[in-house]
Amino acid sequence: MAIISTADDLLDSDVYIDLDHTLGIPLNLKCEGFNFAGSVKLRAATSMVASGLRNGLIDEGSTLVESSSGNLGVALSIVAAARSIPFVCVTDPKCNPATVKLMRALGSEVVVVDRPDASGSYLSARKALVRELCEHNTGYVWLNQYENPANWLAHYENTAPLIAKQFPALDVLFVGVGTGGTLSGCAEYFRENRPGVRIVAVDTVGSVNFGLAAGPRHLPGLGASEPMPFVHRGLVHDVVQVPERDAVRMCRRLARHGFLLGGSTGTVVSGAARWLAEHDPGRSLNAVAISADLGDRYIETVYDDAWVQDTYGDLHTEREDSNG
């Protein structure tokens, strides 16, 4: 039994989904969404705020401000509310409507930028507004998830050791890439402690991570429109890029087995399934993937037929149904 005092005390989950049983994919999926934030981002949010309080960056009278496409904004809303710290989230139109409502319900102020850059991304506009807010408002503190070492340290100190403990014979770990915090923290831990474990980064088509070509993206979470400081090719053994259409197909396929998971999770599972089919036809590898989020916030996007049709066209989901 767990008795907690604050919402961010509920952090660690030992829940793994055996996808071989449901989808025929030899993969264990670590569920990071079973906390009050509903995503892995609660780890980074808790770590960054704790670090800021320790080093004096955050003090009485501070207001936190951060750029987020959604999940980190919710996580920081929870951490800030638990500590009675005001929080302003700068997001964009791609943020799921349910996520915006959730942040506001938690007491956060949400500001939505509306001018994308040439690639259709809002990241540069979000960051510019954060800088402007900090410049013109005394006490505003930007935690800067993109460069704050407490982001990746959360996974170096917690996420990766938990996986290593549960899977002493682990061969390969699949990690989605956004800011690179989860990836770099896990990669550094296993490089130092279990160098035989292969780290496979899973990114979305259209992301510039690892020097790949920029393109349009519709799902918040994974991917980046500009290079992320934590992400470099030397961290990983391989990189898989997944089209968003495939990620949506996988989300819907999982949902038909009762697992309503987020777009980031659909991307990672789709990429892991493709990599394992190519590199482990004998199904001998002990594989784990990190599920970053749950699917309730994607009801109006990934799981909405009209949105999917308008965004991607016909996904031929009936073909996916026949495979699982």
Where are the regions that the model predicts?
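PLP-dependent amino-acid enzyme catalytic core
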Residues: 1-324
